[in-house]
């Protein structure tokens, strides 16, 4: 009977609700994406104490907003909500690829190997610049049902997670750009101010 109870528990786990949304863009996304220069992007987010329907609704609205902007990642501070929540979908054009929801994500460790790759951001449209980051990370977080998870990520997933976690800490990717000339050029071309960039000192 123990085996039967274990199987029932496993099946019940599978039947728990998860977040499912269409990846088709909508004309009026539910959330506004704030842009560089707004204080919302510079305010550190708060930990989520309880994962409930309200948090799942927020994650769903964030996904709809992200898909409508053809993005692959979005953090709650980008939509003016200071909660430690982010959503990612590297295959936003694949309707069969499920998105990922990260609640209270924390990087446990990161590789000594660093990679440079071009990044962009829904909060800084039109700006694409190289950023140096660890090539792989180990992460702890909770999923949309509040279940504790750990994962290893490398490549684009590792980069996207790091980029979005930066947002949770009030950091934008342009803060990490070392090519000052190209930074100023692209910011100016896209009507952003260099004074809104907070350069990292470490």
Curated annotation (Swiss-Prot):
Entries under Pfam families matching the protein: Pep_deformylase (PF01327)
Entry keyword annotation includes Iron: yes
Cofactor or coenzyme needed: Fe(2+)
Source superkingdom: Bacteria
Keywords: Hydrolase, Iron, Metal-binding, Protein biosynthesis
Cofactor note: Binds 1 Fe(2+) ion.
Sequence positions that bind Fe cation: 121, 163, 167
InterPro entries: Peptide_deformylase, Peptide_deformylase_sf
Record field: catalytic activity: N-terminal N-formyl-L-methionyl-[peptide] + H2O = N-terminal L-methionyl-[peptide] + formate
Entry annotated with the keyword Metal-binding: yes
Active site: 164
Annotated EC: 3.5.1.88
GO biological process per UniProt: co-translational protein modification; translation
Region span, Disordered: 1-24
SS bonds (residue pairs): none
SUPFAM superfamilies for this protein: Peptide deformylase
Function: Removes the formyl group from the N-terminal Met of newly synthesized proteins. Requires at least a dipeptide for an efficient rate of reaction. N-terminal L-methionine is a prerequisite for activity but the enzyme has broad specificity at other positions.
NCBIfam families the UniProt entry points to: pept_deformyl, PRK00150.1-3
Name used for this protein in its record: Peptide deformylase
Native species: Prochlorococcus marinus (strain NATL2A)
